């Protein structure tokens, strides 16, 4: 009998946010168990509704949105994206420099496939959003992880970045605000990273999907505005700030000089054409979202759900003996550290599996974000306060006598 194994290209590709632990949670649900899910940044299931004006505009445009559009996206949506970034000081891009995709996830994969040859290297943060590492690997490249320092508010370690640049390095990825740590980078830090890219002729990929989800007066700086002389690729979308993850609307905008990237851009154009276009009806949400009332502010200011849930989750998690955590300044996650000696932990995946089976709470282990040690896990802070209290109380109870 002929067997059809998994492609060798996927041998070192992983995405543990929806990996084996998630599959076990689905199995438990099928058996009738209720699972408290703190594993994925999907706002809608937790009562975060899309702004009404976005839904209205999508519905109004449905009759004219039944066919394909330009492979890069609707002109009106791309124009709105360009104007938004112009207002942020990013001036070196036109409508033709914007690609709209079925979520940022599709565009990350496209961006890597168009750029990398076998053996090319991309600097990726550790910890990272794992799709970046997966996309680099799937494209034949090598993800080289630079350290983000927990003792320095999870900021990237500049010396480690410098040490890992070599002749094979083509690009550096910056995730700011950061997933999974919630760090928001200072302007001075970003300028140091820009200088490394400048000295080594690197493309900068800026994953800024959480740029509007900021706490305690934190300020987000667009790295493309700090590097007008470099090719920067900024990625963002509607999933988080506008609470429409299911619309699958993301964009990628190229800023800076492009004369030395004509081949790369041809590759992006080819890949965009091969998938014809992104979901057309939902592209009508982009112009309304970027130009309308920014309702996300209601959630991040004092009294807002996201801020209050961040505060409650942080207060509860840091009361558990053996757990420490850097307070996140942005996004919708925490990345606590667990004392592996106290709990004799050798496998963080086993720990979250044991928690799931015993307490029916679903988390993602740190190695799922390419962290190098089994001493972290990620908590999503989207659930209501009472749900967070229940989940973290169960975590504390689980850890009270847990030993591997």
UniProtKB/Swiss-Prot annotation:
GO BP annotation list: D-alanine biosynthetic process
Gene3D superfamilies, alphabetized: Aspartate Aminotransferase, domain 1, Type I PLP-dependent aspartate aminotransferase-like (Major domain)
Residues binding L-alanine, per UniProt: 41, 179, 378
Modified residues (N6-(pyridoxal phosphate)lysine): 240
One Pfam short name: Aminotran_1_2
Pathway: Amino-acid biosynthesis; L-alanine biosynthesis
Transmembrane segments: none
Catalytic activity as recorded in UniProt: L-alanine + 2-oxoglutarate = pyruvate + L-glutamate
Cofactor(s) listed in the protein's UniProt record: pyridoxal 5'-phosphate
Enzyme Commission identifier(s): 2.6.1.2
GO molecular function list: L-alanine:2-oxoglutarate aminotransferase activity; pyridoxal phosphate binding
Keywords: Amino-acid biosynthesis, Aminotransferase, Pyridoxal phosphate, Transferase
InterPro entries linked to this entry: Ala_Aminotransferase, Aminotransferase_I/II_large, PyrdxlP-dep_Trfase, PyrdxlP-dep_Trfase_major, PyrdxlP-dep_Trfase_small
Record note on quaternary structure: Homodimer.
Function recorded in the entry: Involved in the biosynthesis of alanine. Catalyzes the transamination of pyruvate by glutamate, leading to the formation of L-alanine and 2-oxoglutarate. Is also able to catalyze the reverse reaction.
Similarity comment: Belongs to the class-I pyridoxal-phosphate-dependent aminotransferase family.
Protein known as: Glutamate-pyruvate aminotransferase AlaA
